[in-house]
């Protein structure tokens, strides 16, 4: 068989009672239960670790469960965590609504303001958590510089690398300690399965693995198999996504109905040089403000015909969304304002369709303004 084997099993048979005891005690290698390990899932984990340059990777049921595992494994009641303001809405909810219940203190410095990160540190700061590029504004942080600050303060740096994937950025090589992925997005690449990944060094990963085996947000073997298929085309897909996204961003920047385009590949982007330095491509996500506020943004979205109105991204199909009322809709207006997410903002995750067809669909949106 040329493809990887798919092991759809919950448990494993042992040769003898002594064999079972030895495996459960960790005295001999081998699978004991698919909540712990599964051959298909293990293959996926090993390939992600190789791509990210990590000592170990562990797969989870979703990107959010990867963040849950990271924080619950490495932080305790009384610890302090710094999270960038520019993160996914559910990530903010997880920190604000749930982690704080366990006595974990959380503050939100601006992503790219290194001085603010250093000033926000406390003696009990345990973890820095960032998305770079961020969702949905494609804001960046100098990962190497932020890692130096975190380590000087005795903290770890975790980077959500979902938008770039290891095909375009490898945060561990820039000094980060842990990398997070929603494998649901570009690792899958076709909107088929849901999963997450935590990758890092041995001492941190031992704690994460222990939590996941106990708590059980386990990746299904079938989804791991889908992700293995996705990894085979990851680099070429990310190159194609990036090329089309840059061309679309440049085109949108010239349109009179657009106030501002957020895409680090643009020469006009204030962090363009940083993106060139720490990424090998600019990714697929292009966000922009239209003139006219929420009503205009909704008219633009509703006028499109080819793209899919959905908050998921990473698909071969282009998706379009209104962050203020969907992915970040649970945030307060004040929190959205601090994150730079206004009512006129539209996020487009550029797929692999013909670029001229995509521009024609965006032109329909512009005509509705």
Labelled PLM ranges:
Residues 1-7:
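Short conserved active-site loop signatures built around small residues
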Residues 2, 13, 39, 199, ...:
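Positively charged, small/polar-rich N-terminal and surface patches that mediate targeting and assembly
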Residues 14-68, 90-97:
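Conserved N-terminal alpha-helix of the aminotransferase class I/II PLP-enzyme fold
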Residues 51, 252-256, 304:
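Acidic-histidine catalytic/liganding microenvironments
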Residues 56-257, 262:
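Conserved PLP-enzyme active-site core in the AAT-like
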Residues 96-97, 105-106, 119, 237, ...:
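PLP-dependent enzyme catalytic core of the Aspartate aminotransferase-like
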Residues 216-217, 304-312, 365-369:
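A common structural junction motif
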Residues 258-346, 350:
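Conserved C-terminal alpha-helix-loop-beta "cap" of PLP-dependent enzymes
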């Amino acid at each position: 068989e040329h493809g990887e084997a798919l092991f759809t099993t919950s448990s494993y048979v042992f040769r003898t009672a002594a064999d079972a005891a030895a495996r459960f005690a960790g005295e001999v290698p081998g699978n004991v239960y698919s909540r712990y390990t599964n051959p298909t899932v293990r293959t996926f984990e090993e390939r992600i670790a190789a791509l990210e340059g990590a000592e170990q990777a562990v797969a989870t049921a979703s990107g959010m469960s990867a963040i849950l595992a990271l924080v619950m494994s490495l932080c305790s009641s009384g610890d302090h965590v710094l999270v960038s303001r520019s993160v996914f809405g559910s990530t903010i909810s997880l920190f604000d609504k749930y982690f704080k219940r366990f006595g974990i203190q959380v503050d939100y410095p601006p992503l790219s303001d290194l001085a603010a990160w250093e000033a926000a540190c406390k003696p009990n700061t345990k973890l820095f958590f960032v998305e770079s590029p961020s969702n949905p504004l494609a804001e960046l942080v100098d990962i190497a510089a932020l890692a130096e600050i975190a380590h000087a303060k005795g903290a770890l740096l975790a980077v959500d690398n979902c938008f770039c994937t290891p095909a375009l950025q490898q945060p561990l090589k820039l000094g980060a300690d842990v990398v997070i992925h929603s494998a649901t997005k570009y690792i899958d690449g076709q909107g088929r399965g849901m999963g997450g990944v935590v990758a890092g060094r041995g001492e941190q990963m031992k704690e994460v693995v222990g939590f996941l085996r106990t708590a059980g947000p386990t990746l299904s073997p079938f989804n791991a198999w889908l992700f293995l298929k996705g990894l085979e085309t990851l680099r070429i897909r990310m190159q194609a996504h990036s090329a089309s996204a840059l061309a679309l961003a440049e085109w949108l920047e010239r349109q009179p109905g657009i106030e501002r385009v957020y895409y680090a590949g643009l020469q006009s982007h204030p962090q363009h040089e940083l993106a060139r330095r720490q990424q090998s491509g600019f990714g697929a996500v292009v966000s922009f403000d239209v003139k006219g506020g929420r009503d205009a943004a909704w008219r633009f979205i509703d006028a499109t015909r080819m793209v899919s109105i959905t908050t998921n991204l990473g698909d071969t199909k282009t998706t379009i969304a209104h962050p203020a009322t969907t992915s970040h809709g649970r945030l307060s207006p004040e929190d959205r304002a601090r994150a730079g997410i206004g009512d006129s903002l539209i996020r487009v995750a550029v797929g692999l369709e013909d670029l001229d067809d995509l521009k024609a669909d965006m032109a329909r949106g512009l005509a509705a303004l």
